[in-house]
Amino acid sequence: MDERLYGDRLGTIKPDLVVSCGDLPFDYLEYLVSRLDVPLLYVPGNHDPSVNPPDMTWMPLAAEMPRPGPEGCENIDCRLVEVSGLRIAGLGGSLRYKQGPNQYTQAQAARRAVRLELRLRLKRVRDGRKLDVLVTHAPPFGMAEAKDSAHVGFVAALRLIQHFQPLLAAHGHVHPYGRTLPERRAGATRVINVVPSRVIDL
């Protein structure tokens, strides 16, 4: 968590939208959405609990049951949404390096991304609009500052950027520990590590 985004300092920031790239406590996300009163989108990180709901379709009123995850926030993992005039897609999780939720092999991440890619292509055919923002937890493969196996990132995220050229690809997962990390480019896409926090104008 970034101390600038807590308490009275939070009142100086007037965003149109808050995006979390994962690994932030759910109660903190709930705090942000209640204080800022703007939409908050998130993807789960490898240190987050599983947000995949169990199959409850057999239950009466299943649609009215609360979903896992922070209240008032929208999980965009493997989803395409339109918020604040932006078309935003999400791909959560990190490369599997131990047993735990929200960790995937490169092959698993590729399968998850294919479903997202199909939605993106269908939307683009229907209305001609392109993707504006890709939100991931892990960085696109080869674009992280860290080179250890847990942090090299997903090939699937890089492929989504190459195919859809969003204005922005925001990721987390790689902690800079006090350093200012450079903004990178993948074609026309700005690739930004948002840890610990960033205010970004589009």
Predicted segments with their positions:
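A generic local structural motif
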Residues: 3-9, 27-30, 61-62, 75-76, ...
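N-terminal active-site segment of His-dependent metallophosphoesterases
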Residues: 1-34, 126-130
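Active-site environment of divalent metal-dependent phosphoester hydrolases
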Residues: 1-4, 25-30, 46-53, 96-101, ...
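Active-site neighborhood of phospho(di)ester-bond hydrolases with catalytic His/Asp-centered motifs
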Residues: 17-23, 40-46, 76, 133-137, ...
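Short, structured coil segments at secondary-structure junctions
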Residues: 35-37, 71, 186-187
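Conserved catalytic scaffold of divalent metal-dependent phosphoesterases
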Residues: 1, 44-49, 55-152
